Amino acid sequence: MQLTMSSSKMKSLLKGLRYISQVFESEKEEEIQIGNPTDVKHVAHIGWDGPSANATAPSWMTEFNSGGGFESAEGVGEDDSSIKCMSEYGGRSRDLPNLPKSTRKAASEKGSPTKDKSSDKTKRRSSNKGTSSSSRRPKEATEEQDELSSWPSGLPEIPKKSRRKKKSTKETAVNGGSSRSTRRSDVDNMSEYMSETGSVRSMPQFDNRDDF
């Protein structure tokens, strides 16, 4: 009996769970159905695939007015002297003559009054600099000459070396050499005399001395 009661309870619980699960599944949102990838066409290809592409295109694509998106360039090849430049943001076209870059720059510089004024100012400055430098140069030269002329007067005079000093030094050198030569000759004479006699007392220089 207990087993039958427990099995009946389990069955009732399972039925309740199934019912709850079915309720939640029914409440789910319906999924959006998307067609095959071949049915979708890129926006950039509109009008390039012919009338068949427009026929198969959806309604929101056909409602799009493409007027003004592209400009017809039929008259571009006729006038070679003008080039249409489309700006990236404003979409405005400006007609410019077909000229080389150097001539365009020259024309723009001639037409601008600010550049003319700046060129005049630079010319004036250069002329003023040239005149000021030319006027300063002679002034600087005269100032340098005055400084050179006043330079020796401010310093004490240095006495010139006399030639007599040089002569005296030469004479002393000669006398010193002669005195040395005489001393050497005396020593040589004494040594020779001693070798001959064997004593110093017999020399006439030491005859009057009592020390020996």
From Swiss-Prot:
The organism's place on the tree of life at top rank: Eukaryota
Alphabetical list of InterPro entries matching this protein: CRIB_dom, CRIB_dom_sf
Tissue: Expressed in flowers and pollen.
Bias (Basic and acidic residues) ranges: 106-121
Domain (CRIB): residue spans on this chain: 34-47
Membrane topology note: Peripheral membrane protein
Note: Over-expression of RIC6 in tobacco germinating pollen reduces pollen tube elongation.
Major location (coarse): membrane
GO cellular component, one term: apical plasma membrane
Location within or outside the cell: Cell membrane
Protein's GO biological process: pollen tube growth
Keyword terms, alphabetized: Cell membrane, Growth regulation, Membrane
Chain intervals for the UniProt region annotation (Disordered): 51-212
Official protein name in the record: CRIB domain-containing protein RIC6
Organism field: Arabidopsis thaliana (Mouse-ear cress)
Function, as annotated: Functions as a downstream effector of Rho-related GTP binding proteins of the 'Rho of Plants' (ROPs) family. Participates in the propagation of ROP GTPase signals in specific cellular responses. Is involved in pollen tube growth regulation through its interaction with ARAC11/ROP1.
Record's keyword annotation contains Cell membrane: yes
A Pfam family assignment: PBD
